[in-house]
Amino acid sequence: PLTKEGFAALEQELKNLKGVERPNIIAAIAEARSHGDLSENAEYSAAKEKQSFIEGRIQELEAVVSRAQVIDTSLNKTDVIRFGAKVLVVDEDTDKESKYQIVGDYEADIEKNKISLSSPLAKALIGKEVGDTAEYIAPGGKKSFEILEISY
């Protein structure tokens, strides 16, 4: 599943790869090819490698976008944590507060506090309400979080 925002971001990346990156790399390959012997042309090899990466990413994104299940999380009017929820929790060991959003695998980005629906923390949070405790096993051991706030 993807949120509307996540789907839009993937579509934008795909548009950029097709409309900007692909033409740029084609031009770079043509430029490198004009420098002569391709067998010892590092510029040409690097451009071909980048082209391969870009084409692979385009294929991957086209597949994801074509079969994406987009969920409008603004329609969630519930006090229960579900896909798309923004959850404020407090670590019961450290009293540190953190806010996470539960998203699909392609949107997950821990630096933006977006956690995958399939992650251990998200699995522990799903179905809980404000005041509940979510427990899961982290690499550093068992973690417990109290749920302070849920929003969509």
Question: What kind of region is each of these model predictions?
Answer:
Residues 1-15, 19-49, 53-56:
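N-terminal cationic and glycine-rich segments that engage phosphates or anionic surfaces
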Residues 10, 31, 63-64, 108-110, ...:
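Preference for short coil/turn "hinge" residues that link or interrupt alpha-helices
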Residues 71-145, 151:
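Non-DNA-binding regulatory cores of transcription-related proteins
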